[in-house]
Regions:
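Short S/T/G/P-rich N-terminal loop/turn motif that feeds into the first structured element of a domain
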Residues: 1-94
């Protein structure tokens, strides 16, 4: 498994984005991926997400499917701004 830290600009605030992300969880799980952690900037204009996946290509193969793009956009995500920051090998959540 690979853990990637990703950022995305959002336009409808944290709560709307968070509801959308939680709604996508079952579909992500079907393809062996899940959100481990997510947080937003103080002005709620961007989110940072730690995603567990089988392969980094998941970001494109899943995140850019037309149906998934429509769901993400409805949740306020600027899909074109999706940016992988780095692979994360170790982390803890207290």
């Amino acid at each position: 498994m690979v853990n990637m830290l990703v950022t995305v600009n959002i336009s409808k605030g944290w709560n709307t984005w968070c509801q959308m992300a939680k709604g996508l969880e079952p579909r992500m799980n079907e393809v062996g991926s899940k959100i481990l952690w997510a947080g937003c900037t103080a002005d709620e204009s961007a989110v940072y997400v730690l995603v567990e996946m089988n392969d980094p290509s998941f970001l494109k193969s899943f995140g850019e499917q037309q149906e998934i793009v429509a769901i993400r956009e409805a949740g306020g995500a600027d899909v074109s701004s999706t940016t992988p920051i780095t692979e994360i090998s170790n982390y803890f959540i207290s």
